[in-house]
Swiss-Prot record:
Entry keyword DNA damage: no
Active site, UniProt feature: 20 (proton donor)
Keywords (A to Z) from UniProt: Carbohydrate metabolism, Cytoplasm, Isomerase
The protein's name in its UniProt record: D-ribose pyranase 1
Source species, domain of life: Bacteria
NCBIfam families: PRK11797.1 (NF008761)
Annotated family: Belongs to the RbsD / FucU family. RbsD subfamily.
GO cellular component assignments: cytosol
Pathway: Carbohydrate metabolism; D-ribose degradation; D-ribose 5-phosphate from beta-D-ribopyranose: step 1/2
Protein localization: Cytoplasm
Primary location group: cytoplasm
One Pfam short name: RbsD_FucU
Amino acid sequence: MKRGGIVNAQLAGALARLGHTDTLVVCDAGLPIPHGPEVVDLAFRLGIPGFGPVLEGILEELVVEEAVAAREVEGANPDCHALLASRLPELKLVPHWELKLRAADARLVVRTGEATPYSNVILRCGVPF
């Protein structure tokens, strides 16, 4: 058994398969999930698991060179915006409709049980060197 980190086998494997410039979406329970990407659905009940803990776990595993969230998060969900801004200095904000369009090009979608508005982010993988 792993000592720590992500112990969900499907999620750990999906993250390990990501390469430089691949994108993944970490989303709330309400974001429409496109049909193309691999999906790891972690949602159990509304609010469980939350967006923050899932994002934090993923950020411990990945190098991120760009992050994109919906501009609407600033006003509708200031706690989520604060988390994103503090953990992702490369964060760019775009209209929510654009975020949904970009999500269709992701290689992986990780759905959480989060039930607050605009708790979504697209991460583009970087390299550790």
